[in-house]
Each structure stands twice: as structure tokens, then as C-alpha cells.
């Protein structure tokens, strides 16, 4: 049916809605100069510690340059004009170094270690004794000569031969190169970063006894069990297993007392995302807010190939969202997800294997550039919007790097200043045609399993002027509302009614405000507006369910910017058109209202607004099409109303005449029907019935409107018309 809409309740202002874990609704306001204000739904300003001023600097149009999403008590705030960067933090670097592991030993083996530095090669060589000796003492010495730690000790340069070593040794010292011994492992390292070297280790058993580790090794299993702390080496991945290269470092700081080789990051590469360029977080502790930078996890393993920085580095983030327990960003043509359950980590924790929880970084595949603007959860997947295409990001039961996929679903041009909104099983997004806007309704056709987006403004191509800059949608109220940049005082609501998969009714209309609507958002059956009146900003609420005034009255009090006044309360704004209504339904002056309040009474004050419904031109038609070969003369019309206190029927028989020459007829319905059961003195009559009125006008020329500027409700269920159709001619 057609009903006069509920009034807005006056409060004080804002922009992004925050639904906290305690189910309180607050609003975040960020002004052009970076000023941040947070208020609750009653307009009370909340305490805020703002440490994010630099991130909000340089704003010119916060409504389009900022975006945010809230989960529990965390709100992620994105400045779309900021380019995300790496910080200068890097993994530790070490001087050139290597390990020589005496893995085996035997009798009569020669071990040779050659080190080249500065173009000169230095060689040191030792030999173990033979197993067969002339005496028992010599045999004991021979056994000592094959001890691996003794061999390692005597292969070192810049040291004298170990006392009582029973083999033979020879070799020279090397400037700028140092040696340390860890059991049967020699640690060779330069005195500075410039003291690099190469080395070769051989033995007379075909290389089975000596192993060298410098820079890279092909076999992780052959790494020694002893090493200096934090020695880093690259392990070549096994291509047959699809394994990437990875890095390990020696770690002696373990709880079980056994040192291990632990996966790590390549030395000397960047590790950190600059938090000052990343989305900031607004946190709520139950009483106050804190806005500031968020520490995102460092890269701890791999290198720039195996574990690269996320693709939003060097780009601007266009949207932020949550999907399947991951924090997500849109940047350029990429969708970037955090690690599952770890919202601040965008690096893999291991590159040895690809785990299901690892971060995801995937680009859309399209034959044209598709900069992703918005992401909207839809039908267990994620709907992605670019200017010319729509994509569906989906996965199997789990969203993982291996199961994620992005497919083009539809190719419709979109006007994406306003973020698309979902309502039920539909997603609505704006389009632009010249100076006017339209709206498409995205859905999945269950019968054909195809995606489509119907243009629900095809019949009103010139109705919505300008570019849509803000949207609000509600599945509770089956409604989508639009604001454009053409006239900020106008809101375009689209009301629809579905039964199953069939849309039985839908209608567009306009709400004209006395102030400029800057923002709107649904909260269940409440629609909140941030409205500017001159230099004042108000947070206003439109309630689509039960009117709050019914707690004091027997009728809804339909006034815009309505407030409840008791005691010494006064109207909190100035408007010469404001009226005062007592709980008995009487309209009184401001002074009379003050007297009534002083006596303990309650008064509702606000600004009257006008409901206008204009009937479409009446057309005579058969089952297939309109019949235009005759004259349709309107005789009478009947309007079925319910719980209605007042309305006017305004008819203009000749709408095509100049305004000064038109005749306008106005008929008033007051709700007081003689003999009616609701016509009781001292009460507000709300009647239900049928109102009939005459027309006597040509359907092509007649303009028929239902109007009401009363604070009393009116609701129209249906209408019927009596007419006479006269054909101009008949077939012979």
C-alpha cells in the first residue's frame, strides 16, 4: 500500500556506522580537515584518542576517498589516496661465511681445504695415519688421528697445529678470514662485509668425508647438527616435489635443548609493511575509541620470489572487507587476503609447503583493464565490481590459495562512486546514462544457474538526476535508497515486494528534505540520516516500524525533525514552520505548548511535510496492449484507505494548459465520518473505508494527486476508476 512515511527524530550528526560487539550503534565522522568525531545513536559524542592525523591529511572529499569496515570492536579505515609502501626495516645481514663439516673419517685419508680471496688461493691439507702400525701406541695414535673434531680443528687456518695431533698438516694463514670450531664443523667468516671468499673442500675418498656449505645447499638433510647461532643458508627446492627454495638458520635457543635448523628469511631484504601507509584501526574498549596505526606482521621466511610482498605495495587500496575469516583488500586488479584467522599477516609463514591458511593474492583475468573498486559478500562468494565488469570470487568448502578462483559473471557498466549494497539475495549497483543515473539488481537465476543484473530503472530513465554518491539497503524493509550529487535534498527510495522468486510490486519515489542529506544507513527498521541545515549538522532517524509517539498518544505523530518535549524542553532548532502537537492531537502555539509542558504534559514538535502521490495516466487496454483509437473519459474514482486521519484529493482536469489557466479542485478527507464509530469528540479519528470523488475529465489531460501535509497518518491500499471509452471509428 501507499503510506505517508515516518518522520525523522532530531539528534546530532555523522557518517560511517559502527556496530560494536556490545550491539551499540555509533557513527564515525571524518571531516575534510581530518577532524574525527564519534557519536552514538542519541548524538552523544564518544571519547576518542586520535593518533591517525597524518593518515587523514590531504583529504579533499572524504566521502569518496575513505572507506571502512567494522568487525566486533575493530574498524579498519582506508584512505584510498595513500600509496602503500614498504618500510626500510630489513632482515639481519652477516659477513661472508661458510661451514666445513667433517662428516666422516678414515685411515690414510687426505683432507684438503682451498680458500680463494682477492685472487689468491690458500690451501691447507692434513692426512690421517694408516690403520696398520708397528706398535700398540702407534695404533692408538692412528685412532686419534681419525677423530672428526680433531680433523676439523687442524683444517683451520691461522692457527697452529693442534698439540698431539697424530696426522700430518700443512697450509698458510689468510688475511681477513677468521675461523671458529664447533665440534667437527669449521665456521669460516670474513672480518667485514668486503672480505668475501670462495672455497673448495676435497678428500681422497671422492668427497664423501668433507662437506662445504656456503650460500646454498641442495640437501637440507646433510646440514650439520652443529653451527654458530643464526648461520643462514639457502636450501634449493626439490622441483620433482614442486618445492620452492627456502632459507634456514641455526637456532640453539630451543626448549628441548637440542639445536635445530629453523626456516627463516633471506639476509638483508625488506621485511616490513610501512604501517603509516596501511589502513588504520579504530578500536573500542567499551567506553572510548582509539584511532591509529596497526602493526602488521613482518615477513619471516623466504625471499622476494618465494614470499613476495603483497601486491598492494606501491598501489592504493580501494576497498577493505572481511570474507571467510580473512581480512581482504582490493588494489588495482588484485584481491589480497590475510592469513586465515590472522588479520594482520599478509606473508606466508612457510615456503616449504603451501598451507591452506596462507595469505591469498590473486588477480582478475579479463581481456580489458579491470580496476577493482568494491567487494560485496554475496551467495557464499564475493562479488567484485570494476567499472565495466562484475566478477565472482569463489572457492570450495575452504578458501585457500589452491581453491580460490575468480570468474567474470556479467559485463555491465557501473557507476561506483557509491558502494553497491546487498539486500536479501540481491545486490544493487548504480549505473550512469548521461546526466541521469539508474540502478541494476544483480541476482543468480536458480533455474539456469546464470548471473544477471536487471535494470530496475529502465522505465524511468530521466527520474534520478546526477551521479549516485550514497546508497542504503534493507532486507527488513525491502528497500533501497539513493542520494545523488545533483540535489542533496532529495532521496530516491525504491520499495519492492517479493513472494518467492517473483517480484509482485515495486515503486520508485522521492523524499524531499529541507536540509542536505550527506549520508544514510539502515539499522534494522531504522534509517539514519546525516543532514546538514545551513552550518548545522543533525543525525536523524526514520523509523519504519512502530512510532515511538504511540507510547503517549493513540495516533502516530508524523512530523519531520520531530522531538518530544516535556518540562522545560524547547525546540532544539529554529524553523518558522514548526508546529506543536499535544498528546490529545491538538495543534497549539509555542507558548501554549510551554504552558502545557509546565503542567506535566507532553508535546511533540516538528516540521510538517507534504506527501504527494500522483496517479499515472489512465489507459484503456485489452489483454495485450493499450487501445489508443478512442477517448477515455474519467467519471469517478474510489480510493481505499486504512487508519487515516487526513488527506486531500487534488485534481486538475486540464494539466496541459498553462499554469495560470488551469483549474484545480481540492477535496479534503478529515477522518470524521458522520455516524462513524471513530467520530468521537476529544479524540483523533482514524478511519478505514473508501473515499469516492468525481472527475469528469479526459484521461489524457487529467492530473490526479493524493496529498497530505497533516501530522496525522494516511495509508492507501488501492484505487479504482470508473470511465467511459468511446471509439473514434468502427471497422466496417
Regions found by a protein language model. Name each.
Residues 1-44, 219-319, 323-371, 434-451, ...:
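N-terminal beta-propeller domains
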Residues 2-5, 295-325, 331-477, 486-488, ...:
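Beta-propeller and closely related beta-pinwheel folds
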Residues 41-46, 54-57, 61-108, 182-205:
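Hydrophobic or amphipathic alpha-helical targeting/insertion segments
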Residues 2-7, 11-19, 23, 437-732:
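Beta-sheet repeat architectures centered on beta-propellers
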